[in-house]
């Protein structure tokens, strides 16, 4: 008989710092602000998706390999190759052709990435004045475009063949943009100040 393995819960030290911050500070702050009756009503981050689109991969397949390598360095996970859903002749694109890569992070990896993004990567963005507050989708999710992959400290600038951007989507359980904005702000996202 095969023995059943027990799931080992991570200790408090093994959990990401932002995960503890969420439980200790963010949840009480949001419960007070939005007057939630139950702790399960408090919005939470469910996943972060990082996508790199490489349209030129048709002409130069090496660009896609570089994007995959860089995305795995940034996120610590193996990227999933994204393929074209339909052919577009103007872009010389065939159906099923590899045109990008994506990583979806959840739980511990998600909080670790968010912490690195907020504390290390965002301050390295040139002429940074805060993240846009208009990039919410109306259902509590937030997307941000990054123009350069070199803002992440994991990327060695000398080994980068070309500057490449990426899309980062933060998916939450929030029902409104206001709740999602409050959640991400409490987690440390540096949003642009609204001018009155």
UniProtKB/Swiss-Prot annotation:
In terms of domain of life, where is this protein from? Bacteria
Enumerate the GO terms in the molecular function aspect. rRNA binding; structural constituent of ribosome; tRNA binding
UniProt family annotation:
Belongs to the universal ribosomal protein uL5 family.
Q: What is this protein called?
A: Large ribosomal subunit protein uL5
UniProt-listed InterPro entries:
Ribosomal_uL5, Ribosomal_uL5_bac-type, Ribosomal_uL5_C, Ribosomal_uL5_dom_sf, Ribosomal_uL5_N
A single GO BP term for this record reads: translation
Output a single Gene Ontology CC term carried by this record: ribosome
Q: Which UniProt keywords apply?
A: Ribonucleoprotein, Ribosomal protein, RNA-binding, rRNA-binding, tRNA-binding
User: Subunit info?
Assistant: Part of the 50S ribosomal subunit; part of the 5S rRNA/L5/L18/L25 subcomplex. Contacts the 5S rRNA and the P site tRNA. Forms a bridge to the 30S subunit in the 70S ribosome.
What are the annotated disulfide bridges? none
Q: What does this protein do?
A: This is one of the proteins that bind and probably mediate the attachment of the 5S RNA into the large ribosomal subunit, where it forms part of the central protuberance. In the 70S ribosome it contacts protein S13 of the 30S subunit (bridge B1b), connecting the 2 subunits; this bridge is implicated in subunit movement. Contacts the P site tRNA; the 5S rRNA and some of its associated proteins might help stabilize positioning of ribosome-bound tRNAs.
Question: Per the record, a Pfam family?
Answer: Ribosomal_L5
Would you indicate the residue range of the signal peptide? none
